[in-house]
Amino acid sequence: MATPANQTGRITQVIGAVVDVQFEGHLPAILNAIETKNGDNRLVLEVAQHLGESTVRTIAMDTTEGLVRGQEVTDTGAPISVPVGAGTLGRIMNVIGEPVDEQGPIKSEGLRAIHQEAPAYTDQSTEAEILVTGIKVVDLLAPYAKGGKIGLFGGAGVGKTVLIQELINNVARAHGGYSVFAGVGERTREGNDLYHEFIESGVNKKGGGEGSKCALVYGQMNEPPGARARVGLTGLTVAEHFRDQGQDVLFFVDNIFRFTQAGSEVSALLGRIPSAVGYQPTLATDMGALQERITTTTKGSITSVQAIYVPADDLTDPAPATSFAHLDATTVLNRAISEKGIYPAVDPLDSTSRMLSASIVGEEHYNTARMVQQILQKYKSLQDIIAILGMDELSEEDKLTVARARKIERFLSQPFFVAEVFTGSPGKFVDLADTIKGFRAICEGKYDHLPEAAFYMVGTIEEAVEKGKKLAAEAA
């Protein structure tokens, strides 16, 4: 129920990002946006609690330095609303929909509230179709669903952002529809780089407008927790509008953990008693409210790729553990694999996908994937024996398994387009058929004669054969 707009109140206390406002008469509804001036800037506060004595407790969407008690605040009578539509493409906006790219105002098709109901069961679509990414380890072992939810899990510095940028490069460029990128509590430098890369690669035009394909919504690390807790919803609102117009939208979020982290900062300031590991007691509810809206309906689809930081590499931490339940495919990045120099450092045994079923991907793909996992699992179980007794104590059959597993491990690596700058090797996009063919041949022993090094950082199996010849020539 929207309250009458233009009601005024006065600030009674400011504690960091939380501001208490006293109203006379009607109280603004929970989640309403109320506005005040902070210097020359418009400061938006979102109502979080009704405290009694005509006072509401609000969360600020920007810094509160400079606010004073007794300052006047106006109720807008509605939740935070942001511009949506084609005018947002090629532009960067913040949590409240203001442009931050210095390219003038956003020409929008109207405003849409950032708090929406999730689509009803009857409106949701359940078709299963594979989204080919061109990344071998993903396409083979944990394939992504079109219109599905994908999570990239990893600790600090194992390559989540590089992987998300490669997916943007491979999928968004080839993709005819629109994309939305929500930068939630990540590095401003990365956001800036991404903006310029999009312009250089032709995904976006400077200043937006005709020909731009991706809308950017940023609430980075330097923003107060209120903005970081809501910027994911702002990005999602832009994506939902495109979906409801019948588009197939790609929605990238980097990083969902920061959304949870911001919620936990705000929760403590709101006086809630923390739950496990100090997270907010409403962790599952907050995550559900965001994730249930990211869905494919009969009108259009949203395929979302979400980077999820794993604190201290512990997948059982409540923040990553809560996100697991919502995803169709999980790509787990492993520090032990990145330490071997194998990139992308995707764990082939820990990553899962509901799409990896013979009825969806076909018998050949399914059997090849399972064969690869079987060999890698056998190698994993032999590692203790190798560490204690050495390779010589293994049976001939086990030695062969180990040799093939090490080749598979290296063949799961691949040079990325977005990493060309710092690796010096050109990126590779590998078709699904080539990926299946290559791994099947390794499992069947057709390339037992090639050295391990031939499989490292190549695209297709033909490139590995070429590299093997080159290595043999150099050794001769």
Swiss-Prot record:
Superkingdom of origin: Bacteria
Q: Which residues form a coiled coil?
A: none
Which annotated residues bind ATP? G154, G155, A156, G157, V158, G159, K160, T161
Which keywords accompany this UniProt record? ATP synthesis, ATP-binding, Cell inner membrane, Cell membrane, CF(1), Hydrogen ion transport, Ion transport, Membrane, Nucleotide-binding, Translocase, Transport
GO cellular component, alphabetical, reads: plasma membrane; proton-transporting ATP synthase complex
Top EC class for this record: translocase
Record EC number: 7.1.2.2
Task: List the PROSITE patterns.
Answer: ATPASE_ALPHA_BETA (PS00152)
Grouped into one coarse class, the protein's main location is membrane
Indicate how the chain sits in the lipid bilayer. Answer: Peripheral membrane protein
The role this protein plays is: Produces ATP from ADP in the presence of a proton gradient across the membrane. The catalytic sites are hosted primarily by the beta subunits.
HAMAP family annotated for this entry?
ATP_synth_beta_bact
- The identity of this protein, by name, is ATP synthase subunit beta
